[in-house]
Amino acid sequence: MAVAAATRIAVVVVVLALAVLAPAARGLRRDDFPPGFLFGAATSAYQIEGAYLDDNKGLNNWDVFTHTQAGRISDGRNGDVADDHYHRYTEDVDILHNLGVNSYRFSISWARILPRGRLGGVNSAGIAFYNRLINALLQKGIQPFVTLNHFDIPHELETRYGGWLGAAIREEFEYYSDVCFNAFGDRVRFWTTFNEPNLSTRHQYILGEFPPNHCSPPFGNCSSGDSRREPYAAAHNILLSHAAAVHNYKTNYQAKQGGSIGIVIAVKWYEPLTNSTEDVRAARRALAFEVDWFLDPIFFGDYPREMREILSSNLPKFTPEEKKLLQNNKVDFIGINHYTAIYAKDCIYSPCTLDTYEGNALVYAIGRRNGKIIGKPTALHGYFVVPEAMEKVVMYVNDRYRNTTIYITENGYSQHSDTSMEDLINDVERVNYMHDYLKYLSSAIRKGANVGGYFAWSIVDNFEWVYGYTVKFGLYQVDFDTQERIPRMSAKWYRDFLTSSSLTDGLQVRSRRADS
């Protein structure tokens, strides 16, 4: 153990030296971003908190899923302990403070606040934990940026209503959000209702990878589900839950608390596979099914034309009253989680295998064109390094949704957990990824995009859903046996970028041996 610890320390020392000596040719300054710009890091409750039964917390859907279907997780593990953030939050707040960020994005565990939903009573211990976390952040000058729902719901709501497939869950979410606004809103200036509902519903109800694991052919062979209908029924209930929460916040809390509220959407950029009209339209159609699916109803009161034409009766319809609720309660900002880009091939006029989640859009997504890959692969399947896509995504959302303020609420680089310790710590690829994506973000801002902040995913390695602990996104390496947090080269680079007025650059050097 002593030898291993000494090796880790030696690696960290070399990492810091490499970061200090890195060349600064292309240049990126914090001053390239507007005054008041938020720079932070992000996490979510299930992925880092642990303490899955502590202090009267109820079981959530991921607790049950990872315990009953461990074979669906790459390493068979779960979030029972994860980063033990519930007990180590003060250490993690200190890490954030030392990093120099001015905001921290985290989510609240619904089952920690309302273990059985609105019928079971509020858990005072859950309220107390998030009060302690929020207060600790504010004492360090860090703004909480709070997500109400990041994939996890109380298990009882899954069994009682069928989760997001049941319309009754809308009232549950409105009640839960009200409890949070009332308990924490005097200190929270940034709220988001949902994280990536456009991604979670597809993994839940098209591919069947996330609980409740519903799907149908050609996407999979689940025991139940309808991949053509259920994702859109669930999304419909999420959108109306969102609208009810936003209406409540704007009516009863915003004026006296002074905060803002939005929603976070996962945005993958789609490039046409060829220059053909069909593939150009396919790329546009993929974006409609990716982005416009949730944002068009919020801004324009209805689903995009492409979805209505293709899905027909499988796409629910809003009543006039529901359209009014959506349009009269627009978000104050849009959160974008952006990581990658991919090619889009038309499947209306060309034969395709429609088994990716773009299949319902009659699009086939592929990472290669003419034998050349779109960007360097990362540890997540289908995720490539394509920095210029950041600018394209931001400009698309900015232009379509009327210059509404945008926050990049997630952006990060994944490594395989079986990478050598030296390369995990000397994460040159992550440094270059962050530098290059930030450069294209600053370019979008110069072109007029209204962007208010950037959050790196993630501050620490954590439980990465069906990948378990087999991939690592953290600026800090975590030893899950000891819970030791070890700064990576990317943490040093990010801190230098945030605290220095001088030019910083990506590291165009290769990792060196720790003992060289």
From Swiss-Prot:
Range of residues in the leader sequence: 1-27
Pfam family, one: Glyco_hydro_1
GO biological process entries: carbohydrate metabolic process; coniferin metabolic process; glycoside metabolic process
Positions of the catalytic residues: E196, E410
Keywords: Disulfide bond, Glycoprotein, Glycosidase, Hydrolase, Signal
Enzyme superclass (EC): hydrolase
pH relationship of activity: Optimum pH is 6.5 with para-nitrophenyl beta-D-glucopyranoside (pNPGlc) as substrate.
InterPro entries the UniProt entry points to: Glyco_hydro_1, Glyco_hydro_1_N_CS, Glycoside_hydrolase_SF
Binding site for a beta-D-glucoside: Q47, H150, N195, E196, Y339, E410, W457, E464, W465, F473
Thermal activity characteristics from the UniProt entry: Optimum temperature is 45 degrees Celsius with para-nitrophenyl beta-D-glucopyranoside (pNPGlc) as substrate.
Keyword tRNA-binding: no
Tissue expression notes: Expressed in leaves, stems and endosperm.
Reactions accelerated catalytically: Hydrolysis of terminal, non-reducing beta-D-glucosyl residues with release of beta-D-glucose
Single GO molecular function: beta-glucosidase activity
Superkingdom, natural source: Eukaryota
This protein's record includes keyword Signal: yes
SS bond partners: C215-C222, C347-C352
Glycosylation sites: N198, N221, N275, N403
UniProt EC number: 3.2.1.21
Membership in a protein family: Belongs to the glycosyl hydrolase 1 family.
Function (record text): Hydrolyzes glycosides and monolignol glucosides. Can hydrolyze para-nitrophenyl beta-D-glucopyranoside (pNPGlc) in vitro. Hydrolyzes para-nitrophenyl beta-D-fucopyranoside, para-nitrophenyl beta-D-galactopyranoside and para-nitrophenyl beta-D-xylopyranoside in vitro. Hydrolyzes the monolignol glucosides coniferin and syringin with high catalytic efficiencies.
Protein name as it appears in the record: Beta-glucosidase 16
Source species of the chain: Oryza sativa subsp. japonica (Rice)
Gene label: BGLU16
